Structures are given as structure tokens and as C-alpha cells.
Amino acid sequence: ALFNVDFRDNSDGYAVGGGGTILRTENGGLTWEKVNNSYPETLKRVDFADDKNGWIVGYGGSILRSGDKGRTWVRQSSNTSARIYGLFMSKKYGWAVGEKGLVLKYEK
């Protein structure tokens, strides 16, 4: 199952879902390809702060970051194993929320 989609512009978009699924489109969603990664956790939300920097959150405290327009994703430390369900990113700030009242803040 897929849980969330975010487009950086009219063409480039990403979708995330169960089993660590990350899909990418470069043609406005006409076709999608799987982004290779080694993260087995369910991924719930993807959000790009700008054209270059993207974030993904999910189960097991998963936080992934991309600084290359989503071509590669690197795991970030969250210091939690809680499920993270929601995400908001801007160029300067980020917020993630999850189970049991979890609130995480990022400041650039």
C-alpha cells in the first residue's frame, strides 16, 4: 500500500508506503519507478522543503533525508522507535509527529 505522495514540481514526484517503498516519477505520474533503498520499515509521509531537500518519515522512528532531489536517501537519527505519521518541512524548520504524543522539531 502507498500512503503519501509529494510533487517537487509539475513533473517530479515521490510516493511512499509499506515495506520501505519509495517510488519516483519524472513525468507527472504517468509512470513510476522504485527507488532502491534498504529500509524495510513502513514509510508514511514524504515532504520536500525545496527543490533539492526532501524528508521521509515512518515506523520504527524512521527519518530519511535526501539532499539530491530524491535520488538517494540517507537515514537520520531520531532517537526514537515510535511510529512517525506526520511531517511538515520548510526551508528552515521541520516538524514530525507520531504515536504516544511524539513531536520532533528540526531547525536548520
Task: Map each language-model feature to its residues.
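Residue-level hotspots at or immediately adjacent to binding/recognition sites across diverse folds
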Residues: 1-108
